[in-house]
Amino acid sequence: MDLFEYQARDLFAKHDVPVLAGEVIDTPEAAREITERLGGKSVVKAQVKVGGRGKAGGVKLAASADEAVARATDILGMDIKGHTVHKVMIAETAPEIVEEYYVSFLLDRANRTFLSIASVEGGVEIEEVAATRPEAVAKTPIDAIDGVTPEKAREIVEAAKFPAEVADKVADILVKLWDTFIKEDALLVEVNPLAKVVSGDVIALDGKVSLDDNAEFRHPDFEALHDKAAANPLEAAAKEKNLNYVKLDGEVGIIGNGAGLVMSTLDVVAYAGEAHGNVKPANFLDIGGGASAQVMANGLEIILGDPDVRSVFVNVFGGITACDEVANGIVQALKLLEDRGEKVEKPLVVRLDGNNAELGRKILTDANHPLVQRVDTMDGAADKAAELAHAAAK
């Protein structure tokens, strides 16, 4: 889960990383009181999870409370690289900046360790610095057990050649950033720029944090960090039902058991779709191993609620998940929707194989629902689902 800048700033403050004061708002007029509290001037910063805000006009200085309101009015609702601005942060203006640095901690998946990246050339994309001046970027592996001690922080500072007058302050901030990284179960903690100001202080002016969704059970407060305004409503509904669902841009709804089978199903449907108007998969939905009839019903309800879906392909290989449970789930889901008075018009193609496949097929045959078609091979079912989706578009 990627955080907004204001959320990253709050986490930094929680772990005693020096930051500037600021508050997030979603209405322009609220900028007035905050700016007055900050001394009559502020920086209005768009809160979007994408870089390049400044170049896009999403970061503006305000020399008065009235100007802050005007800036907030301009920025709220702005589109920045496909992201709509729903909130802005009204932040304290930074003292005169003398130098800008870059520091981060991240999970190095390739080497199965943690990594520190630091540079005295901050304020720009670190990828640009690495490409043009690789010697200016210091990469230091971090032992998962030892972590970042004051001694390790000094090693990072020396490797990146930070000026002597800020070495101790940067080292102290590195220890606190590591504390943030570990205690918040982060995958990335980045400060860019980490600025030396005219007073000699070193302050985190902008930050990026990505948290590990798999660790959310350890952090009840993470729930409040989710961006509900930008969330796809189908993905949000699936999350509430503990379903592994990702919305895609096609027309064939996909349900399968096991991530590998679902990924294969996406490929087979995409291939079949080439012969049927280039229809594509509309989603990834894994109901998992041992899924009950209720889980199947929940998944089907999500997919049938997607207006882009024209047909549904249910592809199940019974192992822990018994095919009769899946079949019962399909029958239950259709009955549930119809009992609510909802119009179910999208055809379902069902392929069942493996554990209790014959019983599952019999349940579907006995139910005799006009929208459900049984196809007993994966390729044949994919072709039929693509054909039906294409026909529905005509």
From Swiss-Prot:
PANTHER family, A to Z: SUCCINATE--COA LIGASE [GDP-FORMING] SUBUNIT BETA, MITOCHONDRIAL (PTHR11815:SF10), SUCCINYL-COA SYNTHETASE BETA CHAIN (PTHR11815)
Cellular component terms (Gene Ontology): cytosol; succinate-CoA ligase complex
Kinase found in the keyword field: no
A Gene Ontology molecular function term of the record: magnesium ion binding
Gene field: sucC1
Name of this protein: Succinate--CoA ligase [ADP-forming] subunit beta 1
Cofactor note: Binds 1 Mg(2+) ion per subunit.
Domain ATP-grasp: 9-237
Record keywords: ATP-binding, Ligase, Magnesium, Metal-binding, Nucleotide-binding, Tricarboxylic acid cycle
Stated role: Succinyl-CoA synthetase functions in the citric acid cycle (TCA), coupling the hydrolysis of succinyl-CoA to the synthesis of either ATP or GTP and thus represents the only step of substrate-level phosphorylation in the TCA. The beta subunit provides nucleotide specificity of the enzyme and binds the substrate succinate, while the binding sites for coenzyme A and phosphate are found in the alpha subunit.
GO BP field: succinyl-CoA metabolic process; tricarboxylic acid cycle
EC number(s) per entry: 6.2.1.5
SUPFAM superfamilies, alphabetized: Glutathione synthetase ATP-binding domain-like, Succinyl-CoA synthetase domains
NCBIfam families according to UniProt: PRK00696.1, sucCoAbeta
Record pathway: Carbohydrate metabolism; tricarboxylic acid cycle; succinate from succinyl-CoA (ligase route): step 1/1
Catalysed conversion reaction: succinate + ATP + CoA = succinyl-CoA + ADP + phosphate; GTP + succinate + CoA = succinyl-CoA + GDP + phosphate
Domain of life (superkingdom): Bacteria
PROSITE patterns: ATP_GRASP, SUCCINYL_COA_LIG_3
Entry binding sites for ATP: K45, G52, R53, G54, E92, P95, E100
Stored Pfam families: ATP-grasp_2 (PF08442), Ligase_CoA (PF00549)
Organism: Streptomyces coelicolor (strain ATCC BAA-471 / A3(2) / M145)
Self-association state and partner proteins as the record states: Heterotetramer of two alpha and two beta subunits.
Binding site for substrate: N257, G319, I320, T321
Family membership: Belongs to the succinate/malate CoA ligase beta subunit family.
Residues reported in the UniProt entry to bind Mg(2+): N192, D206
The protein's required cofactors: Mg(2+)
